[in-house]
Amino acid sequence: MVLSDADKTHVKAIWGKVGGHAGAYAAEALARTFLSFPTTKTYFPHFDLSPGSAQIQGHGKKVADALSQAVAHLDDLPGTLSKLSDLHAHKLRVDPVNFKLLSHCLIVTLAAHLSKDLTPEVHASMDKFFASVATVLTSKYR
């Protein structure tokens, strides 16, 4: 999925508003994912999956850091996320549908915290951004 210039502007603007909350928002989105889609828990058998746990917070920071890198390199998502794609495809073997589920929960979390900023246009751009990230992360599954 190709991000337009307007999409890139929207993604950078909303991610700028996320700011220092990125890790917390990503952790909240992970907790939402695990609660709403219990099958996603199978990849984390060693985690305390209760909302707010140190492990959820830690993994949320990893997700947020990866997304922040993606936002900073919107014109080179494949290069930016290549190592992460290798990890998820070859070592972790995460079912690709889980990226879509997490993306949905990330949008819900953004809406909960930044409702005034998540206009329909920004929402559409973030959907495209998360879909682009998911496409890159699953590109090495083939």
From Swiss-Prot:
Residue numbers binding heme b: 88
InterPro entries: Globin (IPR000971), Globin-like_sf (IPR009050), Globin/Proto (IPR012292), Hemoglobin_a-typ (IPR002338), Hemoglobin_oxygen_transport (IPR050056), Hemoglobin_pi (IPR002339)
Globin domain segment(s): 2-142
Record's GO cellular component terms: blood microparticle; haptoglobin-hemoglobin complex; hemoglobin complex
Residues recorded with modification Phosphotyrosine: 25
Highest rank taxon of the organism: Eukaryota
GO molecular function terms attached to this record: haptoglobin binding; heme binding; iron ion binding; organic acid binding; oxygen binding; oxygen carrier activity; peroxidase activity
Modified residues (N6-succinyllysine): 8, 12, 17, 41
Listed Pfam families: Globin (PF00042)
Phosphothreonine carried by residues: 9, 109, 135, 138
Tissue specificity: Red blood cells.
Coiled coil start-end: none
Residues that, per the record, bind O2: 59
N6-acetyllysine: residues bearing it: 17
Keywords assigned: Acetylation, Heme, Iron, Metal-binding, Oxygen transport, Phosphoprotein, Transport
Modified residue annotations for Phosphoserine: 4, 36, 50, 103, 125, 132, 139
GO BP: any one term: hydrogen peroxide catabolic process
Subunit note: Heterotetramer of two alpha chains and two beta chains.
Similarity comment: family membership: Belongs to the globin family.
Role description: Involved in oxygen transport from the lung to the various peripheral tissues.
Protein name: Hemoglobin subunit alpha
Gene name in the database record: HBA
